[in-house]
Amino acid sequence: MIYRINRKIIKTYEKTLKAVFSMRARNKSFVTFSKIGLVRLGNQLFRYAALKSYSLRNKVPIILPPDTEHRLNNFKIEYLSKPLYWLNYSSDSKYVEKKFNFDSNFFSFHNRTEINGFFQTEKYFKDIRQILQTDLKLANCKKEKKAIENIKLIKQEFPGKKIVSIHVRRGDYVPSSKPYSDGITDYSPDRHLKHPLMTVDYFQSAAARFQNAVFLIFSDTNQDIEWCKENLNIKNAVYIHNEDLIDFKMMQFSDHNIISNSSFSWWAAWLNDNDRKQIISPKKENWFGEFYSHYNMNDLIPRDWEQL
């Protein structure tokens, strides 16, 4: 009985390898990022955008493992799904990001390419903006409509007012003597040395740039929202806390954006389709803490955003 089971396993394994090497023999090109899910949502979007840009420029499909950790399935993104072992056997060239700013050599790799890095600059994907705006609509139409409806209701409540989103990133950025886990990654207590909190003065100064506005204030948890109520002291403020995808879309559908040093709010602002939008961002040198002070940050903040 054991012998028969082992024979079956061996045949399945041989069949899999045969399919893999058959694909290689036919020189089927693709691009993949097998570790795309090992970061939080905003960083996953940077990685996906770079993948998509590479895919379109080199005319190769995107292949990803069916990884429950990545959250791309929340969006209207199309890609081929293959098991991780398939990717490990099939990819024959690798691109690893060596520096934080834009690298034009990224697009020169061909055939079956595995990429790895953060790709945190629009220079990798600015020219496919409209495509990404379509891809990054929520797969759950009800959630997308909920965000749109929420913005409409706020505009009805505050007629004639500009809708300005403020994202106050706290959560794991708050200094703590205890480790922190978001369910994906375990963070050490010194995380604030990597990602400093933006000051109250930053948010107040940014808000002061907008006249005749209502401010939608978003943060990580109910506790963080309470902190905002007690400390920000911004007039005409509405405090919002839904599930993160609806918050993300509400920020995107606002008229203007004030962001934190957060890839989550970076993406909500970047996807904002208002032609007259004003986006205020922390200065590039304040994005990371001393732990990442050696990073070249010149390409992170789009040129048409105001750094404060």
What kind of feature is each model-predicted range?
Residues 1-16:
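Boundary detector for helix-to-coil junctions that initiate low-complexity/charged tails
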Residues 15-38:
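Nucleotide-activated donor-dependent transferases that construct or modify glycoconjugates
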Residues 36-46:
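A short, glycine/small-residue-rich beta-strand->loop->alpha-helix junction that serves as a flexible
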